[in-house]
Amino acid sequence: MASDGKWFYYYEIGEGNPIYKKIPATDASLMRIISIPIQPADILDLIAGRVPLREHHTVILHKQDTGQGYVLVLKRRWWGVAEKIYMDENKTRVRLIEYYNRNGTLIYRAGFNEMQMVSGFQVPARLSISNGEDADFQLDLNRYYTDVPVTDSMFVLNPPD
């Protein structure tokens, strides 16, 4: 998989030869690849330790009913809950994020299971993503590079020859 911000490139691997795919990044979803409807931009934000924020009109901070910590609830005017952000007791660390559709059904859940300091940045060491039902995966990030010079060509996956 690769993305240059304009296009999302990937190889679909099944029986036979890999199939090269190129779709607009704005339409990209990893549903066909990992069975979770998450956008590549969201994955990149999560890997960078950022929280992808959904459009919202209201923000409410609640103390968690079970366990310690707080929940930041982002709501849209006619939609209801768009996103929930679960934080620690000090409100300094995000532990879990949940995204919802307009029916209130969970789209996906992302958890920062372990964090690490790399060159002064707080980034995930272990990240888990789930649809809340039958699909989930875990990313273990053990090599992190920061402030690396990059060129546009590094983000393009070319079709096979």
Task: Label each PLM-derived region with a short phrase.
Residues M1-P40:
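An acidic-aromatic
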Residues P24-G69:
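Hydrophobic, well-structured mid-protein blocks that either form specific transmembrane helices
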Residues I60-P160:
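Gly/Pro-enriched, hydrophobic low-complexity segments
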